[in-house]
Amino acid sequence: MANLPGDSIQIAREYMDSLLVESRIIGAVRPTSRFEFLGESFDTPIMTAALSHIDLVGMAEGAVKAGAAVSIGMGDNDTLGEVINTGAKVMKIIKPYENHDEIYSRIKFAEENGAIAVGMDVEHSIHAGDPEPDNIHGLQMKLPSMDELREIIGSTKLPFFIKGALSVQDAERCAELGCRGIILSHHNGLMRYAVPPVRLLPKIREAVGDKLILIADGGMESGFDAFKALAIGADAVTVGRPLMAALKENGADGVRDKIKEMTDQLLAMMYRTSSADIRHIDPSVIWEK
């Protein structure tokens, strides 16, 4: 999809690069990147994205070394168990399977084996190029109705996140349904001409206040990007492609080093803007070109 008209990855990148940061260095104190999430404490608000079809165990091992939370995508229950056994604090994102037994069995396994949250990437229910339901590895997807989502969310004691909520309307519906949070994502450009997740952050934060945890996904290539997202409404960010490249090049240590590099970049921006911690970044430091 790259270089095609309406490439959402390119649109998101261009928007991110249009955001500028105002320096406020006089009187600044050395900041901390500590991140409190679902009763757990982490060294960074930079999380792994809900990736699939890679070495998820290696990714988790690297995240643990960097003090980061982990989200994972497709993979069987055995793989989820192996990831949790690394010591990672894991959010399991589940596909919108047409057969709801597939959903409930994965939720149950996540509950019983120590995941800290579960969720669903609802945006993966519709095929990228036509209005037909998606099919992944022979398993049919289907967009759940509001009532079905309410039942799914209510079936678990774990905090539930919707991945792919990318509008004020969807965010408000997630709050109504009892979600703990949303992951703002265009799913690697699945939808053409998508509004960049970061561009929607301020409006969604204004609409839902503190009712939802907001996690920004898509196009997070540096700690500078993470800073911008945190400044305008995100509680955390997830990173995909840069960590996939680091994992391929140097395994778990590569993931650790990349997360630490991005966290250092984040801390540098926080220091230069008098942001003592991630909860106290003044959104007015962000300017648009």
Protein language model regions, located:
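C-terminal extensions of enzymes
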Residues: 1-9, 243, 251-289
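Alpha/beta enzyme core
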Residues: 61, 65, 98-216, 223-246, ...
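Structural signal for hydrophobic packing residues in well-ordered secondary-structure cores
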Residues: 13-23, 111-114, 156, 208, ...
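Active-site cofactor/substrate anionic-group-binding motifs, chiefly glycine-
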Residues: 36-76
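Active-site metal-binding loops of divalent metal-dependent hydrolases
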Residues: 51, 218-220
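An N-cap/entry alpha-helix motif that binds or orients negatively charged groups
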Residues: 1-42, 280-281
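Short, charged beta->alpha transition segments
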Residues: 29-37, 71-83, 106
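A gly/proline- and charged-residue-enriched helix-loop-helix capping module
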Residues: 65-101
